[in-house]
Amino acid sequence: MSDINEKLPELLQDAVLKASVPIPDDFVKVQGIDYSKPEATNMRATDLIEAMKTMGFQASSVGTACEIIDSMRSWRGKHIDELDDHEKKGCFDEEGYQKTTIFMGYTSNLISSGVRETLRYLVQHKMVDAVVTSAGGVEEDLIKCLAPTYLGEFALKGKSLRDQGMNRIGNLLVPNDNYCKFEEWIVPILDKMLEEQDEYVKKHGADCLEANQDVDSPIWTPSKMIDRFGKEINDESSVLYWAHKNKIPIFCPSLTDGSIGDMLFFHTFKASPKQLRVDIVGDIRKINSMSMAAYRAGMIILGGGLIKHHIANACLMRNGADYAVYINTGQEYDGSDAGARPDEAVSWGKIKAEAKSVKLFADVTTVLPLIVAATFASGKPIKKVKN
């Protein structure tokens, strides 16, 4: 202690000059990127993420999210030949080894945005095993195949836009004509689906409802309807198209909460007295059964609300997910599910206590492209970890 400090009152010494405990050897030093160094120029996404891990705040959470995604992708269990028949219900890799079942959820605004192409990439290349989205996440994907969405501004006035037939999603603009084109496209499909439903009921009788787990049965569930839309749109820019082609189910428990709901409502008048029926119970059985069959379960939740809880609740059926990555801007002070951190889900049994989890507080559009570039699309081989 210096001479000056020795002359300070003891109270000041204790308050301001309090000694620290010894720093543990495993403490990580905060450090950012030194762009004056040659290796910091033209960095790959993987290198950038590695450097962000030690920056602190949400940059470190981005790094943690990438680590967890890599972990859920790398886990491997037994080979299918080592299993009894009743154990062969989960997901397997191309070599026949058990792998993590990855559930991805996203809100409709992300499909409206340019993140749609990132989400399509993940489904196109079979990097997720099931999807949960809201009605807008279904219809906006289809509508973008028919007409584009445009960049606007957050500050554009609602009255003026309404007069011009322009719908605003944040700083995006969707011409109302897009929804008119959507109606023209979807109504004939709904007509055909109703026809197939009626023919099936006539052939099999009322008991055909018992066969609703038959994927070819036109007793429609939301996921079956969405699969049909993906088949009908036949457009490689579409998430739904690739989900249909790769047999990846897209669940939407709120299918009527959007333009699709409007179309179904309009169709009730057109088809009356006949009605298209949609069974939500069939889908809750399907997604919960997927969770129960999973050898390990991972959640990638982009946004909040229904899509977040629907996946988390499915994971409750297996006593919790093994991995969880949340990305949203929700805060927990109001008790909202969107704002809740992973530890709250642990209390409900929706995430395992020993699970790897993180909540990244960020706008998905700003971080997901970077995260995907550093993980799913990095080009680096998956380091398969057998356990």
From Swiss-Prot:
Its quaternary structure? Homotetramer.
One GO cellular component, as annotated: cytoplasm
Q: What class of enzyme is it?
A: transferase
State the species of origin. Saccharomyces cerevisiae (strain ATCC 204508 / S288c)
- Classification of source organism: Eukaryota, Fungi, Dikarya, Ascomycota, Saccharomycotina
| Metabolic or biological pathway | Protein modification; eIF5A hypusination
The Gene Ontology biological process annotation of the record reads: spermidine metabolic process
Name the chain's protein: Deoxyhypusine synthase
What else the UniProt entry mentions is: Present with 7600 molecules/cell in log phase SD medium.
- Function as written in the Swiss-Prot or TrEMBL entry: Catalyzes the NAD-dependent oxidative cleavage of spermidine and the subsequent transfer of the butylamine moiety of spermidine to the epsilon-amino group of a specific lysine residue of the eIF-5A precursor protein to form the intermediate deoxyhypusine residue.
Reaction catalysis annotation: [eIF5A protein]-L-lysine + spermidine = [eIF5A protein]-deoxyhypusine + propane-1,3-diamine
Record key words, sorted: Hypusine biosynthesis, NAD, Transferase
Question: Do you know which SUPFAM superfamilies this protein is assigned to?
Answer: DHS-like NAD/FAD-binding domain
Q: Which residues bind NAD(+)?
A: 108-112, 134-136, 140, 257, 304, 329-330, 363-364
